[in-house]
């Protein structure tokens, strides 16, 4: 199959419309991270690239007759998902039934290997190359918040009831709780960024924003006025004080929970959970009906979610040193995880994720 590789801003208006139409036509591709607007936003944040390296879009069928699209960050020897590690989903957006060997895409990108870490289920071309999977949790409120709340309580989940109790308690003790959607407060945005950086410092994790482009990406999406794609800042104030905030990504009928934080001084009242509840109630008044929580085995995700999809990690590679090195790394990981070594068994997987994170931040 003919595959053209172009920079995101080189896509014609027709190609962008075609990409968006293919995504809209398939409910399984309902994610802002799979849209052409995501690829272009990441490209703007990263800045111009030279040569064959940088953010690229593989156009299956060619730019004159596009049948599918896959965005990737292309390096000297390997490629990664566009926007990694800031993207929560990856996948090929293509015509239904389109058959493609993903190794053709790897060859067209001019690399020896394409890694993925959150490949959506249903991506049949990539399924044989997956090395493992985990659930990614979703809240579907298409039937309205009241129906969702009833369903959760029937499932034996008390989280929403507990949030209501804490809301009444904080209003008695500290003052009114105020929810804002599409906040334009730069002060609140900056506070959310600081909360996130503080959390990374306290847990010994890498500050993703220190790489520069991830924070530029957040600022661009926060400032976006595009009705079809962009960021949305949700805030929750207790009295006059910002207690919790989320900068999420929106597209189609989905809001994807992305950057979240709260003031630890209000921990006893769970302001972050109150904010989730307010977002879900707000969805009754807007075209959005799905709050995507992403992957990660957190209690609040298990309790709030009423749907899930599988996301997989793995790689596609041909006969190359890059592919052989990755296969060897996964082999070591499998052996370690099969042994009863406790936390030591997880070290190879953690090392791989750490290296991928650093590669993505370049």
Segments from the language model and where they lie:
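A conserved beta-strand-loop-helix scaffold within acyl/acetyltransferase catalytic domains
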Residues: 3-79, 119-136, 151-268
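Acyl-donor binding region in acyl/amide transferases
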Residues: 55, 60-67, 73-136, 249-309, ...
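Short loop segments at secondary-structure junctions
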Residues: 63-64, 96-97, 140-144, 239, ...
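Intrinsically disordered, low-complexity, positively biased terminal segments
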Residues: 89-125, 182-183, 204, 208, ...
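Flexible, glycine/proline-enriched loop segments at strand-loop-helix junctions
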Residues: 91-95, 150-155
